[in-house]
Curated annotation (Swiss-Prot):
Biotechnology annotation for this entry: The broad substrate acceptance, high catalytic activity, and stability at high salt or substrate concentration of the enzyme indicates that it can serve as a gentle method for deprotecting phthalimido and o-phthalyl protected amides in new chemo-enzymatic synthetic routes.
pH-linked activity: Optimum pH is 7.8-8.4.
Name the UniProt record assigns to this protein: o-phthalyl amidase
Organism whose genome encodes this protein: Xanthobacter agilis
Post-translational modification: The N-terminus is blocked.
Length: 453
């Protein structure tokens, strides 16, 4: 269905409909269309939620937008390869009704950003560039979450038991139930399991030993110590501030034991396990932790009178988790995994306090990009914020402008934080730009890159 519309002083033609699998789609073409189409997995929801200003800005700047809504059965049938197929159907419809765009930019956040990366690598014949905001990569993210949650289970379960809350078995991290306790989006749970983990975190935080151990688990998982909204960014030189922030962050994560949307990721391959640690030495992961976190953890351990190496051995001594080869075969296909080999330019943004997707994943992909000699096709930028996908209209506009300059000239403009903030501010969206240098947040190497032969 096509209809003219005016929204926030932008006149555009809108088309909405349903794809054969029941997913909704939307197309908006402004009167001043510049010939460029921005395609987004989450356009339908994005135009009506707190991110709507991003899409309003695109229309004001002359970009057409087209995309889908996530399928209502996604929690049980997640398949990014199929989502890409749907986006191609939307592009077919756009071309039939509005003509072929001069350029197509794949754009998306979270699962939509994974799609952006995957499209750039394996389905690039219909796009010219990709912008990926807060991208996950399924096996990578579930392994990173497994490392932190496994360490938490190993190190602080005793506080839960000693406080009389129940047995250690209450603190599950894998093989989670499809019993309705997970929200329909696949993100977040209700009920006994998250409540048990909150009790465990509260009990551990009441002691110097527990605070030190929670910080160690975050370091082993390569998780940011700053994940809770409305909390101050911790001074990386202040161990107690880091411990405070780790506790608040753990409480934020408690709604998704085992890792954000683990049930959805496990359901995708018929409930089979996609993460593992049966071949992991957590002593190696400790050595590879963020240096500031290592320093803070060591000081917290010294203050608590604990033996750090003994606790790492405690983690190493626990029964391990094996992946299902069926699940790994499912995820090791085009569209479902990425290997750092894009065919078109990619700009990747991430917030350092993203609670759903550890920012450390960016380093893993960047390293693969370099291994494959693709540095000229790739740039990254980081944003000083907690939350997830709450990039401002200014930050989004800057990302698109950078991509447009790369496509127009064949050269990347500067992606230094000050320059990105200047581009963002020039967009006059009335929103804040928070691009930042990592400066102390770097990791030596990402632990969980998955690039099967």
């Amino acid at each position: 269905m096509q209809a003219p519309s005016v929204h926030q002083h932008v006149a555009f033609t809108e088309e909405i409909g349903d794809l054969p699998d029941g997913s909704s789609y939307m197309i908006r073409v402004p009167e001043n269309w510049n010939g460029v189409l921005i395609r987004d997995l989450d356009l339908v929801s994005g135009t009506s939620n707190s991110n709507a200003a991003r899409y309003e800005t695109m229309l004001k700047e002359g970009f057409a937008v087209a995309g889908t809504a996530r399928h209502p059965l996604r929690q049980w049938q997640y398949d990014p390869a199929h989502e890409i197929e749907n986006l191609n159907h939307v592009l077919d419809t756009f071309e039939e009704n509005y003509g072929s765009p001069e350029r197509v930019i794949q754009y998306g956040c979270s699962g939509g950003a994974h799609v952006s990366l995957a499209v750039a690598e394996d389905f690039s014949d219909r796009v010219d560039g990709s912008v990926a905001l807060a991208a996950h990569t399924p096996v990578w993210i579930m392994n990173s979450f497994l490392d932190g949650w496994f360490s938490l289970q190993s190190l602080i379960g005793e506080y839960y038991v000693e406080a009389g809350h129940g047995p250690l078995s209450d603190l599950a991290i894998t093989k989670l139930p499809n019993d309705g306790s997970s929200n329909s989006s696949g993100h977040g749970m209700e009920g006994d399991l998250p409540a048990a983990w909150r009790n465990a975190f509260t009990a551990a935080n009441a002691t110097p030993e527990g605070r030190a151990r929670m910080a160690l688990a975050f370091a082993l998982g390569q998780w940011s110590p700053w994940l809770a909204d409305n909390t101050p960014q911790p001074d990386l030189d202040d161990p107690e501030a880091i411990a405070d922030s780790v506790y608040e962050s753990a409480m934020r994560l408690a709604g998704s034991p085992g890792g954000e949307a683990r049930i959805m990721f496990e359901n995708a391959a018929r409930g089979q396990q996609l993460s593992w640690n049966d071949d992991i030495d957590y002593a190696d992961f400790w050595e590879n932790s963020n240096p500031a976190m290592k320093s803070a953890v060591q000081e917290l351990y010294d203050t608590a009178g604990l033996d750090l190496q003994s606790d790492i051995e405690t983690v190493n001594s626990q029964p391990r988790i094996e992946a299902s080869q069926y699940a790994l075969d499912y995820w090791n296909t085009p569209g479902r995994n990425v290997i750092g080999d894009p065919e078109v330019p990619v700009l990747r943004l991430h917030m350092i306090g993203d609670y759903q997707i550890p920012y450390s994943l960016v380093q893993g992909y960047s390293d693969l990009i370099s291994e494959n000699n693709n540095d000229d096709l790739y740039r990254t930028a980081f944003v000083q914020s907690t939350g997830h996908c709450n990039f401002t209209a200014a930050e989004s506009s800057a990302a698109i402008e950078v991509m447009m300059q790369r496509l127009d000239t064949g050269e990347w403009p500067s992606t230094e934080p000050d320059d990105l903030n200047a581009i963002a501010e020039a967009s006059n969206t009335g929103t804040e730009a928070r691009f930042m240098a990592l400066d102390g947040w770097e990791i030596p190497e990402y632990n969980r890159t998955w690039k099967p032969e």
